[in-house]
């Protein structure tokens, strides 16, 4: 799960938005409503051809950063408005009038008189002609991990101060004359290597070349032991630019301190740097298991991550990773290439993925270490029971209208509701194209709608749940339901392989689903699941099973925590005549 908070203030917020608008970029037509309007355009120097995409206007009271970097689910969020544009020509103005919906302000006309730090941005779409016959317009990843505010090729304006007066009938013009530059390839080292392949499976689905990548951490002694073959540790998580949490040089003691609002820690950047260097020291030191560790780069046109499973909307990412990417890595870097010597681990999104791939490809992995997983039982889709609740935003009641919480702190104080979080996404993109958390769950789990985009699990404006879509989700991606449904055949393949950890005050209520899964697992027979479910007392997202350190520190130690446990699993569960010696040196 990808956090979208810029502050740890814990005040409740109320938000009401209008539905995401239709394109308003016609250069001529009836007179616009009175009041300020914004006319956004890009010059031919940026593109001589018309473009499609989502056009944003951002209004801020804070000039310490560009407004495009100030939009979040937190209390310090600034304001954003968005419309779709199709075939917008260079020099042609797209007009955002007072009725354009925004977040967290209802509409542009509701901005009070004042001087604001204003910026425009165009998140550009491309046309995909998929193998299923649908033609869709989506923002392809450009190496940034599906981040609209830093995507190479997107047009934007330099921010400037603008006086907005709701009583003044005027057009405020903004030129999107800047373009986000390409992202350079990450450097390689003796230990860190980068892999990129064109996937035939994904290219066939999307109707254009599509790629998968991975960052590979080689074991100490890799070159000195050319006959060694290694176990594979697959670390799942969000889009990685390079192998995360790793550095081969001592940290600079004079680097300026950066305060972490999330953990209320000063100089947290120094803590991260030191932990990254400690991983290098442990990894290269005596006694650490010699394995290949990889982080997979699999962004889709919907998100920074495919969730590593096959999907009607995303395509066959699960098979592409398992049948194309991983065999390529194991062949190139001398992996053992058998299920007993593969392991998967991760937290949040990576936690769900670790559990899902262990279940969907049970013979290909020998264990999953699952931290703070995204909802693994859709009876507790955070705080919504998709099979019984009628509305995702409010508790069902004839007389009351109580909002469902979306984010809390360790004391249970709510700082964002489910409605607010989803309304932000509605402004960022129509038809599930926000590139954010709730929309990617929908893109992964939903059937394809008649328009070629993911069929909504609920109405983004009202929160009304679609029970038919929920049933599709249950049969295909509700991991808890699938365990219960298929335990007779799946259970023997999963015995001793599921290890689940979560804080009992997870910020996103992800512990609720774990309780339901634990209830089933502890009651299993023939076989008993023989794994582990553990909880961190008052621990927030993303607790990973370490009772000895605060979450701010343990989250930096996944590899040291779990890779030694993989070796224990090989000793307990392996076929006849396994390779358990060549990589032990």
Predicted features along the sequence, with ranges:
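General helical structural elements
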Residues: 6-8, 28, 419, 427-428
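Contiguous beta-strand segments within globular domains
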Residues: 32-42, 48-56, 209-215, 234
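Positively charged n-region of N-terminal signal peptides that target proteins for export
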Residues: 1-5
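Signal peptide processing junction and immediate N-terminal pro/mature segment
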Residues: 18-30
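Non-catalytic cap/lid and distal C-terminal segments of serine-dependent acyl enzymes
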Residues: 45, 60-103, 107-585
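Bacterial N-terminal signal peptides
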Residues: 7-18
């Amino acid at each position: 799960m990808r956090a979208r908070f810029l502050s740890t203030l814990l005040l409740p917020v109320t938000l009401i938005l209008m539905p995401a608008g239709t394109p308003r970029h016609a250069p001529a037509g009836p007179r616009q409503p009175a009041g300020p309007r914004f006319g956004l355009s890009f010059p031919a120097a940026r593109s001589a051809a018309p473009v499609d995409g989502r056009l944003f206007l951002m209004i801020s009271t804070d000039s310490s950063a560009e407004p495009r970097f100030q939009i979040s689910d937190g209390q310090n969020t600034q304001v954003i408005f968005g419309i779709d544009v199709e075939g917008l020509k260079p020099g042609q103005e797209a007009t955002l009038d007072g009725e354009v919906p925004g977040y967290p302000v209802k509409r542009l006309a509701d901005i009070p008189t004042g001087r604001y730090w204003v910026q425009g941005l165009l998140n550009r779409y491309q046309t995909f002609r998929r193998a299923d016959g649908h033609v869709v317009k989506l923002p392809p990843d450009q190496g940034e991990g599906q981040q609209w505010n830093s995507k190479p090729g997107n047009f934007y304006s330099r921010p400037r101060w603008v006086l907005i007066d709701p009583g003044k009938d005027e057009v405020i013009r903004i030129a999107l004359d800047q373009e986000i530059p390409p992202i350079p390839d990450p450097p390689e080292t003796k230990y860190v290597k980068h892999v990129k392949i064109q996937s035939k499976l994904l290219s066939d689905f999307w109707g254009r070349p599509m790629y998968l990548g991975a960052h590979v951490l080689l074991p100490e002694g890799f070159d000195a032991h050319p006959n060694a073959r290694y176990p594979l540790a697959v670390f799942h998580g969000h889009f990685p630019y390079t192998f995360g949490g790793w550095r081969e040089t001592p940290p600079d003691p004079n680097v300026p301190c950066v305060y972490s609002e999330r953990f209320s820690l000063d100089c947290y950047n120094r803590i991260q740097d030191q932990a990254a260097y400690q991983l290098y020291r442990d990894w290269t030191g005596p006694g650490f298991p010699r394995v290949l560790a990889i982080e997979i780069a699999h962004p889709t046109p919907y998100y920074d991550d495919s969730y590593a499973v096959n999907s009607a909307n995303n395509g066959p990412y699960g098979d592409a990773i398992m049948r194309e990417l991983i065999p390529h890595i194991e062949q190139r870097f001398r992996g053992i290439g058998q299920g007993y010597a593969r392991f998967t681990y991760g937290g949040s999104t990576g936690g769900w993925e670790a559990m899902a791939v262990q279940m969907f490809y049970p013979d290909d992995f020998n264990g999953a270490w699952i931290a703070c997983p995204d909802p693994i039982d859709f009876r507790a889709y955070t705080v919504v029971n998709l099979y019984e609740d009628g509305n995702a935003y409010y508790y069902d009641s004839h007389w009351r209208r109580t909002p469902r919480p979306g984010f809390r702190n360790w004391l249970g104080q709510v700082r964002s509701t489910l409605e607010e979080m989803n309304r932000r996404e509605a402004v960022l993109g129509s038809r599930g194209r926000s590139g954010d958390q709730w929309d990617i769950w929908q893109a992964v789990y939903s059937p394809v709608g008649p328009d070629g985009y993911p069929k909504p699990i609920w109405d983004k404006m009202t929160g009304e749940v679609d029970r038919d879509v929920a049933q599709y989700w249950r049969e295909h991606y509700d991991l808890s339901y699938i365990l219960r449904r298929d335990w007779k055949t799946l259970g023997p393949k999963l015995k001793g392989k599921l290890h689940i950890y979560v804080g009992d005050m997870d910020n996103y209520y992800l512990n609720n689903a774990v309780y339901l899964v634990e209830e089933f697992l502890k009651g299993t027979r023939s076989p008993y699941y023989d794994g582990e479910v553990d909880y961190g007392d008052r621990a927030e997202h993303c607790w990973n099973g370490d009772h000895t350190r605060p979450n701010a520190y343990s989250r930096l130690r996944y590899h040291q925590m779990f890779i030694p446990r993989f070796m224990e699993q090989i000793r307990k569960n392996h076929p006849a005549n396994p390779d358990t010696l060549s990589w032990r040196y």
